[in-house]
């Protein structure tokens, strides 16, 4: 049919940016020359490792269906996308391993070394945690006790209701049993020749 008429460029292959890779190669060559010449290469100063101040989002895409085509950007494809390292990880455990790993931390500009805490910092942290625990315990004790009392009351009510229902059921069974015996005696069916006495 119309093989050349009105078609757009449907080439989905990745195009390499030659200029960018040329610059990287030149940079690597200059570093190698400096090593050979005996000049020490300046080590990159990295920050000490610090904790995250945000929550890692693992559940926003959970249960959603996404249509993926060849033109879909990598960040929207299946799995967890790391925008710092520009990579996709397929499951949450590997994603957590990745964001806690060396490569990711290096791309963030941090080393894997942790700042050494001083004695004062440790004491302050203990005080803060102790205050939190005391506040939590006070709230927890009162709320928990009230909850337990309510549950005990509900159980006692349910137990009483069950006993009353059983009492009623037994009384009804006794009445129907006695009526059946009387009816059988009137009709002449009492006992059917058994020697066992009914009480």
Swiss-Prot record:
Described function: Involved in pre-mRNA splicing as a component of the spliceosome.
InterPro entries, sorted: Matrin/U1-like-C_Znf_C2H2, Snu23, Znf_C2H2_jaz, Znf_C2H2_sf
Assembly notes: Component of the spliceosome B complex.
Keywords assigned: Acetylation, DNA-binding, Isopeptide bond, Metal-binding, mRNA processing, mRNA splicing, Nucleus, Spliceosome, Ubl conjugation, Zinc, Zinc-finger
GO biological process: mRNA splicing, via spliceosome
N-acetylalanine PTM sites in chain numbering: 2
Recorded GO MF terms: DNA binding; zinc ion binding
Annotated crosslink Glycyl lysine isopeptide (Lys-Gly) (interchain with G-Cter in SUMO2) location: 8, 36, 39, 45, 55, 61, 64, 70, 102, 123
Zinc finger (Matrin-type): 80-104
GO CC annotation, single: U4/U6 x U5 tri-snRNP complex
Leader sequence residues: none
Gene3D superfamilies reported for this sequence: Classic Zinc Finger (3.30.160.60)
Any single Pfam family the record assigns to this protein: zf-C2H2_jaz
Provenance organism: Homo sapiens
Name the record gives this protein: Zinc finger matrin-type protein 2
Region of interest (Disordered), residue spans: 27-46, 150-175
Subcellular location: Nucleus
PANTHER family per UniProt: ZINC FINGER MATRIN-TYPE PROTEIN 2
Superkingdom of origin organism: Eukaryota
Comp. bias regions, Basic and acidic residues: 150-173
This protein's encoding gene: ZMAT2
């Amino acid at each position: 049919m119309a093989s050349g008429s009105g078609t757009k460029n449907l080439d989905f292959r990745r195009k390499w940016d030659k200029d960018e890779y040329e610059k990287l190669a030149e940079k690597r060559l200059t570093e190698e020359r400096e090593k050979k010449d005996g000049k020490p290469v300046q080590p990159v100063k990295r920050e000490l490792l610090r904790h995250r101040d945000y929550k890692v989002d693992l559940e926003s895409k959970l249960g959603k269906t996404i249509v993926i085509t060849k033109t879909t950007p990598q960040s929207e494809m299946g799995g967890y996308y790391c925008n710092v390292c520009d990579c996709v990880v397929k499951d949450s455990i590997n994603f957590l391993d990745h964001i806690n790993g060396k490569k990711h931390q290096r791309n963030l500009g941090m080393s894997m070394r942790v700042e050494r805490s001083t004695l004062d910092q440790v004491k302050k942290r203990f005080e803060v945690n102790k205050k939190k625990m005391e506040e939590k315990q006070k709230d927890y004790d009162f709320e928990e006790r009230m909850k337990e009392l309510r549950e005990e009351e509900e159980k006692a009510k349910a137990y009483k209701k069950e006993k009353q229902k059983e009492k009623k059921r037994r009384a009804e069974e006794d009445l129907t049993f006695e009526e059946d015996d009387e009816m059988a005696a009137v009709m002449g069916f009492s006992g059917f020749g058994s020697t066992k006495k009914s009480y």
